[in-house]
Every structure is written in C-alpha cells, then in structure tokens.
C-alpha cells in the first residue's frame, strides 16, 4: 500500500563523525545529537534543512462520546475547530510563536462547516459509530481516509514541505486511542485508559468499562491494523495514520504529538514498520497509557511537560528543539575549523 524505504545506514558513520567532531565533548548535546543524526539520515547528510513545515490538525467526532466518557459534549469539537480558525486556541498561540503554518482538517465532525470557514473538508462521515456497540466505520471509509490524507501530503510535498506535525481535536478520541493501544500492544484496556479531559471517578470507571466492552465486542476482527481502525478507530486517527505513511513514503519527517497522534503512529507502524524511522516523538503526555505506548514503540520523547491538551501543542513546543538540532549540525564549528587541539 505504501512503499516506504527504510533509512539507509550508508552515511550514518559520516553523520555521526560530523556530530562527534563539533566543538564539544562527545555526547554533550545529549538527545539533540540523536535527533540530529535521525534528521540528517532522513533529509540528507550535507546541510539538511527543514522547509515549509506544516502543522496539520485533524478533527472528528466519536459515537462513544454520547455515552458520557468526557466532561465535554460532542458539540465542543466543532466549537474548538471554530476557535482554531479564529486564532484563539493554544495551538494557534504556539504555532505563531514557532513559525509553523497551521491547517485544520474536518475528517468527520458531527456538523459540516461552511465552505468559507477555511476548514479543509475531508469528511468521512458525521462522527463514528459508538465502538462499544458497533464498528466505528467501514473498511472502505478507512481506505478513503488514507487516500484523502495521502493527497493532502502529496500537495504539501509538491510545495516543498519536508516536515509535518500532527495534532487532533475530537471529544471522545482518547477512548478510541486507548482501545487501539490495548489491541495492538496487548496491554490491558484498564491500563490504557486515562482521565482524558479530567473526568471524575465514576465517569472514569464507565469509560474503562466501555473500552473493555469495545475490545471484547470486536476481538475476532482485530487481527489486521486496517480492521482495527474500522472497528475501534476515529476518522481523525485514520487520516493521521494515512498522513504518517504517506509522508514517510515521500521521505518527510513526521512530528508526533500526544496520546491520540501516538495511537495513529502505532497503527502506522503495524501497517509498515519502516515509517517508524521518520517519526519524531515530541512529548510524553499526562495521559495514563502514553508512556507505555511510547515504550512499546521504543520512542524517547523530546519533552515531558505533563501536557494533556492535544491539538498538536506538544509537537509545536518541540519544534524549536528540532530546529536547534538542525542548526547545530549545520552551523557549529568542528575542532579543526576552530583551530582547537585536544
């Protein structure tokens, strides 16, 4: 489905040598050095540059939300999308600060937006089915979502973009993400479920029960990652998964945000493991299962700020660190350049 090349180790030694001979002790820049190595392997060992980076926020509603798994009703998804378009959300503040161009994609919010809203229409439906009662969507919808996401990535790639950052908005989407995590990692559903938007103990218990119910209901159909998306996914999770795979196929870096985006990354890795090479995990969120999911994918996040918002906020906040890794690799003098003998 996606022809993703594993990263070649051909130039890894030369890249590491360039990092090691900068005017610093070996390893002194810590995790930035590993990040620079990854970026240079993806974008090229000679003067890699991040060009036309994009923050893509995917929005959709979830049928399970009507069963009371969140403090917020489903209507808040559309209200927050309008807030994004008005420039008033945290993701707007952070993308403006770090110089990321933001776009918002409607993958399946309950009510469609006006054509002049500025929201990109990639709707797969008006919210998913309630996953604890029936499948979220058809397999055809999953495939259509992948195609839509790939078309959007291709457009950005044609315009010179070589890095995308992923965010999301969707009341109820931590429930789908937790169910996906449980199925694909084997971790008990109860250990994947977090408080999401800050629910109370009774709501938390109901959320755990409904997710366990969803996993049990669909267990006979969950042996394929595409079917996992169809049974327990979300329209925005589908399109984030497609975007990851399409971007990796085109040799682009993909910055993963929090728990929901990481669930999409987990599905993508199960579809084609080579896409993992192109992912940068921006942060570990405060959501209960996120650190276990990151551990499963052998991902070391750049930040750990206790964030629990989504929207792409962690990915935006990590972007200056990604740029710093590029800049030190390209601009920092070597001992030889500086005339320093050790």
Curated annotation (Swiss-Prot):
Keyword Transferase found: yes
Gene: cobT
UniProt keyword RNA-binding, yes or no: no
Pathway(s) per entry: Nucleoside biosynthesis; alpha-ribazole biosynthesis; alpha-ribazole from 5,6-dimethylbenzimidazole: step 1/2
Database matches in NCBIfam families: cobT_DBIPRT (TIGR03160), PRK00105.1 (NF000996)
Physiological role: Catalyzes the synthesis of alpha-ribazole-5'-phosphate from nicotinate mononucleotide (NAMN) and 5,6-dimethylbenzimidazole (DMB).
Keywords noted in UniProt: Cobalamin biosynthesis, Glycosyltransferase, Transferase
Cross-referenced Pfam families: DBI_PRT
Gene Ontology biological process terms in this record: cobalamin biosynthetic process
CDD domains (alphabetical): DMB-PRT_CobT
GO molecular function, one term: nicotinate-nucleotide-dimethylbenzimidazole phosphoribosyltransferase activity
Catalytic residues, chain numbering: 311
Top-level taxon of the source organism: Bacteria
Taxonomic lineage of the native organism: Bacteria, Pseudomonadati, Pseudomonadota, Gammaproteobacteria, Alteromonadales
Listed name of the protein: Nicotinate-nucleotide--dimethylbenzimidazole phosphoribosyltransferase
Family note: Belongs to the CobT family.
Enzyme Commission number(s) of this protein: 2.4.2.21
Reactions performed catalytically: 5,6-dimethylbenzimidazole + nicotinate beta-D-ribonucleotide = alpha-ribazole 5'-phosphate + nicotinate + H(+)
């Amino acid at each position: 489905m996606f022809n993703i090349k594993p990263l070649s180790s051909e130039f890894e030694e030369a890249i590491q040598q360039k990092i090691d001979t900068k005017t610093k002790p070996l390893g002194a820049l810590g995790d930035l050095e590993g990040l620079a190595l990854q970026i240079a392997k993806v974008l090229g060992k000679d003067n890699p540059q991040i060009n036309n980076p994009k923050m893509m926020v995917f929005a959709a509603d979830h049928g399970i939300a009507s069963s009371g798994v969140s403090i917020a009703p489903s209507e808040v998804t559309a209200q927050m999308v309008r807030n994004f378009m008005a420039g008033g959300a945290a993701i707007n503040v952070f993308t403006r600060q770090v110089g990321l161009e933001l776009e918002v994609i409607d993958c399946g919010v309950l009510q469609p937006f006006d054509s002049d809203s500025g929201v990109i229409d990639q709707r797969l439906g008006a919210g998913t089915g309630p996953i604890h009662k029936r499948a979220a969507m058809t397999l055809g919808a999953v495939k259509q979502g992948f195609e839509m996401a790939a078309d959007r990535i291709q457009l950005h790639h044609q315009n010179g973009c070589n890095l995308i950052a992923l965010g999301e908005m969707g009341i109820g989407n931590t429930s789908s993400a937790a169910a996906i995590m449980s199925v694909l990692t084997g971790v008990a559903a109860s250990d994947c479920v977090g408080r999401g938007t800050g629910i109370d103990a009774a709501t938390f218990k109901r959320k755990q029960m409904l997710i366990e119910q969803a996993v049990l209901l669909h267990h006979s159909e969950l042996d394929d990652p595409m079917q996992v998306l169809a049974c327990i996914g979300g329209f925005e999770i589908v399109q984030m998964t497609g975007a990851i795979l399409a971007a990796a196929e085109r040799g682009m870096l993909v910055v993963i945000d929090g728990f929901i985006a990481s669930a999409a990354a987990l599905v993508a890795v199960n579809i084609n493991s080579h896409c993992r090479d192109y992912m940068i995990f921006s942060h570990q969120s405060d959501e209960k299962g996120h650190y276990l999911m990151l551990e499963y994918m052998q991902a070391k996040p750049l930040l750990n700020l206790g964030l629990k918002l989504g929207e792409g906020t962690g990915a935006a906040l990590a972007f200056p660190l990604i740029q710093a890794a590029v800049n030190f690799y390209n601009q920092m003098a070597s001992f030889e350049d500086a005339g320093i003998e050790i």
